[in-house]
Curated annotation (Swiss-Prot):
CDD domains: Peptidase_M54. Zn(2+) 1 binds at residues 132, 136, 142. The keyword Membrane does not apply. The gene is amzA. This is Archaemetzincin. It comes from Aeropyrum pernix (strain ATCC 700893 / DSM 11879 / JCM 9820 / NBRC 100138 / K1).
Length: 183
């Protein structure tokens, strides 16, 4: 079992004060022992990752950029989740809410499509997508349980439908690999 899981929430393209509360809520929702840190110092997204045709960022390129800038953190085992104040895509998809690059130890969540509705709804959606990408960084695949945070979301309505929690099956996989918070 891995002894310490550390996540750093990184604002990309906006001031990150909202991430402090998000880090606390993510730690509370994570079924395994983990430390969640939040940077309030934003990283600018790489302009070379921006598609002017699509008006979106290439999520793979953004992940690679974060990895190169914060390599020393990743080398120490810290998993980075960039929260990008923009829209993102990967080839073959019109958009993505997030992308985990497990080999890099980096994931990103894209906020543009999560911002419809009130601020409370946005914060809840953001929490769900951060937990979803954290699950991928910890080795979880998509889950067929539509209420599980690891369920794949094709629309913001599907994000709203799932809970900000791991289902019993996904939770068991994490606890088996990383131990439970009660240990």
């Amino acid at each position: 079992m891995e002894s310490s899981l550390t996540f750093l929430l990184l604002p990309v393209g906006f001031p990150g004060e909202v991430l402090v509360t998000l880090a606390r809520r993510a730690r509370e929702a994570m079924p395994v022992p983990s430390l969640w840190l939040a940077s309030t110092d934003p990283l600018e997204p790489p302009i070379e990752a921006y598609s002017w045709e699509r008006m979106q960022f290439d999520a793979e390129k953004v992940n690679e950029h974060i990895h190169s800038v914060l390599y020393d953190y990743v080398r120490e085992g810290i998993r980075i989740i960039g929260v990008v104040d923009a829209d993102g895509y990967i080839p073959g998809f019109n958009f993505v809410f997030g992308l985990a690059s497990t080999a890099l130890g980096v994931a990103t969540v894209y906020t543009r499509r999560l911002k419809t509705g009130g601020n409370g709804l946005y914060t809840e959606r953001l929490l769900k997508e951060v937990l979803h990408e954290a699950g991928h960084l910890l080795g979880l695949d998509h889950c067929s349980n539509r209420e599980c945070v690891m369920s794949f979301s094709r629309s913001v309505e599907e994000v709203d439908r799932k809970a900000p929690l791991f289902c019993s099956s996904c939770k068991a996989k994490l606890v088996l690999k990383y131990g439970s918070r009660g240990q």
